[in-house]
Structure formats: C-alpha cells, structure tokens
Amino acid sequence: MDPGAGAFSEEQFREACAELQRPALSGAAWELLVETQGISVYRLLDQQTGLYAYKVFGVLEDCLPDLLADVYMDLAYRKQWDQYVKELYEKECSGETVVYWQVKYPFPMSNRDYVYVRQRQELDFEGQKVHVILAQSTSEPQFPEKSGVIRVKHYKQRLAIQSDGKRGSKVFMYYFDNPGGQIPSWVINWAAKNGVPNFLKDMVKACQNYKKT
C-alpha cells in the first residue's frame, strides 16, 4: 500500500463518525473481549492473516474532546507519556507528512516500527463537533528498514471523539496491524485485553498534564 496525499476519502471520515454514534458490530463475528474502566473492546478474526482487528467503544471521563484530539496528535508530547515509544517523529515526504514510530517490545522480541500517514478532520453531527483521525501504513523510501527492528507493513487505525455531554469524551477506535515475526499468543492477548484500556487510561492522564508541560 502506497497512499498519496489523498490517502483518505470523505466517506472514511463519515463512516468513523457514524460508528461513534451507532457501533457496527452486527453482520460479522465481532466478539466482546473485555469490558473495563468504562471501555469495551471487541475483536474480529481476519481470515486472511489469522490476526484480529479490534474495535473500542467507551467514555473517557474528565478529558474534553478538543484536548484529547490535540494530545493524540502531539507526537513530541507522546514521547513523554507513552513508555513504549522508542522513537517517534514526523517528516515531510513528497508533499505529505509521514510519521515514523518505533515501539518497544519485551525481551527477547524485536522492536517493531511503523511508517504511516494520518489525517485529522472535524465533522458536524447533529450540531456536535466530532474529531476524526485516520491513519494507515505507507511505503516511503526515506524510511528504510532498520537492522534488528521488524517493519509493520499493514497498519490501520480510526479514531472518532466527541463530547459525552459532560466533561468527558465519547470515543470509538478501530485498530488492526500485522506485527510480523513470531509473537507468543499471550503477548497478543495481553495487548488487546490490557494494553488498549491502559493506553487510553494513560492518555487521559496525559490530557490532565498537557497544559503543565
């Protein structure tokens, strides 16, 4: 996949916004994996790869939507609060902004890295502002693969955020990647059951500390 500057269509943004309002879990074998801290995580087996795609729904309290979207987009700040970031930066390539992200994996597994494009839009849904952020892997020669690090070549994420009507954020997230290599099933299960809710919890804490930095 080698998306250009128009990597995402307006329809993709609208679909993410719509799923925030009404979860699309019927018509496919989505199964509830875990409910914790106000967050529900569902998974769907991808028959082609044998891996799972994930959908996350829930409310993050005491974290306003504008702030949450800003924190999510701020790569420099993420390096301060996300303990799994080894390297993270963005670079202009052929007229578009490309993100390089290297993730720490537990020993003895190799770290993974991602090269991806992302876009953010603000949509209106019945008078409410909805932040939608889309990301997907891309191929860019300015980011050659590194020795000892496994490149994740299939990565896709969708995030939609709006007010919960109080001082929190209602969120929807879709996530799929193919990390490659031989990863024990316990690591994958842990990441889905604990990693995603913990990441969102850490992001709420990061929101509360954002203006202090």
Swiss-Prot record:
Changing K55I: Loss of activity. The modification Phosphoserine is found at S139. The modification N-acetylmethionine is found at M1. Its main location: cytoplasm. It is found in: Cytoplasm. A 1,2-diacyl-sn-glycero-3-phosphocholine binds at Y72, R78, Q157. Keywords: Acetylation, Cytoplasm, Lipid transport, Lipid-binding, Phosphoprotein, Transport. InterPro entries: STARD2_START, START-like_dom_sf, START_lipid-bd_dom, START_lipid_transfer. GO terms for molecular function: phosphatidylcholine binding; phosphatidylcholine transporter activity. This is Phosphatidylcholine transfer protein.
